[in-house]
Amino acid sequence: MKRKDLLGLDGVSREEITSILDTALMMRQVVRSNNKKTTHLQGKSIVTLFYENSTRTRMSFELASKYMSAAAANISASASSVAKGETLIDTGVTLDQMGTDVIIIRHPMSGAPTLLAKHVKASVVNAGDGMNEHPTQALLDMLTMREHLGGLEGAKVAICGDVMHSRVARSNIYGLTTMGAKVVLCAPPTLIPPRMDEMGCTIAPTIEDACENADVVMGLRIQRERQQKGLFPSVAEYCDHWEITPQRLALAKKNALVMHPGPMNRGVEIASSVADCGQSVITQQVESGVAVRMALLYMLTRRENV
């Protein structure tokens, strides 16, 4: 199947996801080697166009591009013509005319990558759009899970935290359910959007129910900057009822994985002792991010392989 863009995981097949993850395993060998340089993207140009702040996602895309010998450039909206009023489409068309092969975009508006993709010849990768999707984060999460669990079919993944504002949660639900995993969400009712169960996941009444016999326990950051009003009484009350603590983690399987997309609010959605425990693969998620993004860029520039 040929695919010009990766705008989300909604509608992406199991075969496509498996192909990306298999390719990422090969790219991980490059990331772990002493010579992090290949010629896979030699002659290609990659631009990261970020309208929101980012550390992990932007840096991993930039490193992925450079490890494969692409010409890589970063555009910050605040330091470009966007600050002068240039539209997203005009910016995209300008980059297109400069011969850009892939545009990686992060934008506060849901659907912005889809809009951009309709107006440019370059491949467009969604690096996070509003509260919609963050497909590469879900792919790196699945790569990390698959490496430790041996597969995703039948795995129970508990996702705990600010589901309402989380594009990571949505992409993980799409991807994990496609791969046959069982996704369980838990959060205060005010942080669970309506009709989430229609996406193929279940909603647990308590974090204890979500963690029970789970293969993976994933925390989500409480995104206070996206909240228009207080959706829970206080941080202290949130912690009392919903924080991932050692006691709650103990309800999961003995070797259950602890995950978090970052950045973390330690002592809010996840206890520091849990984030740093032997079951935590949070730092490995970062490594997986570079490998997944290398794989995706490689495959998008050779569309017959996607």
Region roles according to the model:
Residues N35-L143, R266:
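Phosphate/diphosphate ligand-binding glycine-rich loop within oxidoreductases
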Residues L41-I46, E153-V157, N255:
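Phosphate-coordination loops involved in phosphoryl transfer and adenosine-cofactor binding
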Residues M1-M59, L63:
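Positively charged, low-complexity intrinsically disordered leader regions
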Residues N255-A256, P261-V306:
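Adenosine-phosphate binding glycine-rich loop
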Residues M196-S273:
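Rossmann-like adenosine-cofactor binding region
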Residues Y51-L63, E147-L220:
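Glycine-rich phosphate/diphosphate-binding loop of Rossmann-like nucleotide-binding domains
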Residues M68, H119-K121, M179, D197-G200, ...:
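Short, structured coil segments at secondary-structure junctions
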